[in-house]
């Protein structure tokens, strides 16, 4: 009842002029932080996991957790495959109950990207599963995939329209200057490119690599058509640093129920800020 597709979430965001944050989780504690915070703020959120996360935690386990927590908090949640590349892997998870997919073939030439994505779209739409794909490629590291900055490239607005029409995707991830990971200095986002893409494509647009972006930049991208904001590294960093600090200050600590609380609190602050930046509080 409460586990939903991202399609309606993002269409609502597009109409409402806000964005839905997609938070990458890794285990029970990180999922608790996202769901509890979202429920308290009545904010729509997407629970995202890379292939590595699904391998680590188990697809069935993650689906069961999302379903149980959605019912517990009476809060709609979507579980989303982030940066998945293999058709068979996606198909297996869709058959298990996942209803939102990102097929990432952005590393392929344009025509091959279209072909790979369309194969996934044709399969997923049979199950009423929403599909996101990426045109252009971000630098940085996501899971085990490292893209050098020299190999990253921005989304071509005219190609974006052709790509969307040829594949039948439900949302489009764009490359406008963000990167996976944290930034050594503030990135210069190509807002004019984003505005141009918006003129060519009427789908909800997605921004990856949002960890560490300023509130001003996030809100400007939303004004120009971004409907989904992906955050991963910033959550991991906050959680990990708080845990390290606690264990340094309390070397005698051995109970995870105690020492994980500070990590959850630090991550909760990040989740709350991103929800505020996205303007989605009270929109669930």
From Swiss-Prot:
One annotated GO biological process: D-tagatose 6-phosphate catabolic process
GO molecular function, one term: zinc ion binding
UniProt pathway annotation: Carbohydrate metabolism; D-tagatose 6-phosphate degradation; D-glyceraldehyde 3-phosphate and glycerone phosphate from D-tagatose 6-phosphate: step 2/2
Keyword Zinc attributed: yes
Positions bound to dihydroxyacetone phosphate: 181, 209-211, 230-233
Residues at the active site: 82 (proton donor)
Record keywords: Galactitol metabolism, Lyase, Metal-binding, Zinc
Superkingdom classification of source: Bacteria
Enzyme nomenclature, EC number: 4.1.2.40
Disulfide bonds listed in the record: none
Cofactor annotation remark: Binds 1 zinc ion per subunit.
Catalytic activity as recorded in UniProt: D-tagatofuranose 1,6-bisphosphate = D-glyceraldehyde 3-phosphate + dihydroxyacetone phosphate
Keyword hit for Zinc: yes
Function: Catalytic subunit of the tagatose-1,6-bisphosphate aldolase GatYZ, which catalyzes the reversible aldol condensation of dihydroxyacetone phosphate (DHAP or glycerone-phosphate) with glyceraldehyde 3-phosphate (G3P) to produce tagatose 1,6-bisphosphate (TBP). Requires GatZ subunit for full activity and stability. Is involved in the catabolism of galactitol.
Subunit structure: Forms a complex with GatZ.
Protein known as: D-tagatose-1,6-bisphosphate aldolase subunit GatY
Species of the source: Shigella boydii serotype 18 (strain CDC 3083-94 / BS512)
């Amino acid at each position: 009842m409460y586990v939903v597709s991202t399609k309606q979430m993002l269409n609502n965001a597009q109409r409402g002029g806000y964005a839905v944050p997609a938070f990458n989780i890794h285990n029970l504690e990180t999922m608790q932080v996202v769901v509890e915070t979202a429920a308290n703020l009545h904010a729509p959120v997407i629970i995202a996991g890379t292939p590595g996360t699904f391998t680590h935690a188990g697809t069935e386990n993650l689906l069961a957790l999302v379903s149980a927590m959605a019912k517990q908090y009476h809060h709609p949640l979507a579980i989303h495959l982030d940066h998945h590349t293999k058709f068979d892997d996606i198909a297996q998870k869709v058959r298990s109950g996942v209803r939102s997919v990102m097929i990432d073939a952005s590393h392929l030439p344009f025509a091959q990207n279209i072909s790979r994505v369309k194969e996934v779209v044709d399969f997923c739409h049979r199950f009423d599963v929403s599909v996101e794909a990426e045109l252009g490629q971000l630098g940085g590291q996501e899971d085990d995939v490292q893209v050098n900055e020299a190999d990253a490239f921005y989304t071509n607005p005219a190609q974006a329209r052709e790509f969307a029409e040829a594949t039948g995707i439900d949302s489009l991830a764009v490359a406008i200057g963000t990167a996976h990971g944290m930034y050594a200095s503030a990135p210069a986002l190509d807002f004019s490119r984003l505005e141009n893409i918006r003129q060519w494509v009427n789908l909800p647009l997605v921004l990856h690599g949002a960890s560490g972006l300023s509130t001003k930049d996030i809100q400007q991208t939303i004004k120009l058509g971004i409907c989904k904001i992906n955050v991963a590294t910033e959550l991991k960093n906050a959680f990990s640093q708080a845990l390290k600090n606690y264990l340094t200050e309390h070397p005698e600590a051995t109970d995870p129920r105690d020492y994980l609380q500070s990590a959850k609190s630090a991550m909760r602050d990040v989740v709350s800020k991103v929800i505020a930046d996205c303007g989605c509080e009270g929109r669930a």
